[in-house]
Amino acid sequence: LKCYGIFRKIMTCPQGQNICEKFAYSPMHNGWMYSWGCTSNCHKGPLDKCCSTDLCNY
């Protein structure tokens, strides 16, 4: 599965990894924080976006 984010043109990942959506809990943001990052375990989430965690499915 190859999927890319909107930053694919300005962000490069190591070989075998893709740019994916990531969600992480951030107390500073008082909740879930959305970000992008490189990961090798992508799966296709909503709107054909690349996700790195199951949280992307909601």
UniProtKB/Swiss-Prot annotation:
Cystine connections: C3-C20, C13-C38, C42-C50, C51-C56
Keywords from the named record: Acetylcholine receptor inhibiting toxin, Disulfide bond, Ion channel impairing toxin, Neurotoxin, Postsynaptic neurotoxin, Secreted, Toxin
Location in the cell: Secreted
Iron listed as a keyword: no
Gene Ontology CC annotation, any one: extracellular region
One of the record's GO molecular function terms: ion channel regulator activity
Repeat found in the keyword field: no
Swiss-Prot/TrEMBL GO biological process terms: modulation of receptor activity in another organism
Role description: Produces peripheral paralysis by blocking neuromuscular transmission at the postsynaptic site. Binds to and inhibits the endogenous nicotinic acetylcholine receptors (nAChR) in the human rhabdomyosarcoma TE 671 cell line with an IC(50) of 266 mM. Not toxic to mice by intraperitoneal injection or to zebrafish by injection at the back dorsolateral region.
Protein name as annotated: Short neurotoxin MS11
Organism name: Micrurus surinamensis (Surinam coral snake)
